[in-house]
Amino acid sequence: MVILLASGLIIPPLLLASLGKEGYGVWLLVGQVTAYLPILDLGVSSSVGRFVAKYNAKEDYESLSRIISSSLFLFLMSSIGVIIITLILWPNFSKFFHLSREYFNTGRWLIMLIGLGLAVDFPLRIGQGILQGIHRFDLMYLLRATGTFLRLILIIAVFGWFRSRSLIVLGIIATAITILIDVLMCSYVSRKSPFIVKFEYKSVKFSSLREIWSLSLSALLGTLAALLFNQGQIISVGKIIGTETVTIYAIPIMLLTYGSMVTAYITGAFKPMASHMQALNEKKKLQKLNIGGVKISFIISLFIAVIAIAFGHPFFKIWLHASKDLSSADFAMLSNILTIMVVGFAVGVPQNVSTKMLSGIDKQWFVAFVSLAASIVGFCLGILLMLKTNLGLYGMAVGWATVFFVKGVLVFPIKACHHFNISPLHYIKQAYLPPLIAGGILIVIIFLIKKVLDSSSFISLFPSILLCMIVYAISVYFFCLSQEEKMRLWNIVGFSKINAS
């Protein structure tokens, strides 16, 4: 997590300074377009681990062999599909996005490089699925972190020290590291897994393919929703307004994506926990888990929102100061887009807890359909506002925030209250009101800090945010946490004997 966040803070300003606003925009566009290609695995990647865990626990190695061989067969078919689509995109990508003469050929060859790299990588994804199935999450996360670290070091060396401006070199680095890490995962499972991992065509059965698809299609809908939500909007911005604006629109999304990872890390276990409680018919525990999880997530998302609104503009000027392409108007637009997006983010992210819990109690199809519908609504609204009004990028940002509003206000809280038998008034009082009190105190502190400290430099901005964090943490402790939660917190930090009151 730390390496990923560090990478997210270091790489964008470095590449923006090296490649320029247009060059970085081309890189982002290629990334968003090729992000759709993994859809061709039809959700298989997300289901392999579950089946491996199931049949390995039963020591049913015949079924395990069928699942692995059938999954590999599907991955190989997907690779062929990726190659075909890449060959179609290759001559048309630069024309479609009206790339300038400087980036016309580069854009085409970059699409070819990334697309063929994905085709090679598809079958290698089986390694990650098997690692999940044999519960070697530690190794999987270690290898992923290693890949992120290697990518960071190479980009710093090539674009920071050697001042390269080549998008092709950047594509080679990104593709090679991804393939290398997946090769290492496959190498490990082929040598260390408790069963033999190999592809046998005779083990590819239609029944196994159907079994895999039965679990993977709901995950596929969720993937489609996420792609339409982020990549679809960024691609539309590049097509309708221009390549240079992609950078302005994508950077706030990137920052909020890293912010959502913090809550995702905390709530990652809610799905299996809900499944376990549902199996034992522990209704009170399900209520408590949902309310507590939403409250913690809202505490985090509200802090991110208030800090982003208060300090977004000076942060962007300090963070991206090395880029000579960004004007004062660009920095103002970055800050305004972030403000629009973060409002939706603050109210929507807490309900990720409900989506995980509902998925854990066999409501994954409901979650998938709602997520896809919300993404379609937000996408269409953003396009409409961008084309039919003078809002431009702000219109698309409103569409982005609308997705969170639909899921986080109109649908999932109501569904959670109904399914977990929680009174809406009690839900608001327990999950949302305490963080709002802490947030109100934070706003007052920010107002006072801005009266005293200038936030135009890192030396003054960092202490301001640190002070806000300390005050907010104290407010959360006294106004948001129950006595039981306080005791649990002290136990976590190693002071179990201290009275939390």
Residue ranges and their predicted role:
Residues 1-8, 147, 174-193, 205-276, ...:
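Transmembrane helical elements of multi-pass membrane transporters/channels
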Residues 14-36, 67, 167-172, 207-216, ...:
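Interfacial/gating helices of multi-pass transporter permease domains
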Residues 119-146, 189, 342-376, 383, ...:
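Membrane-interface junctions at transmembrane-helix termini in multi-pass inner-membrane proteins
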Residues 42-58, 133, 194-195, 252, ...:
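Helix-loop junctions and terminal segments of transmembrane helices
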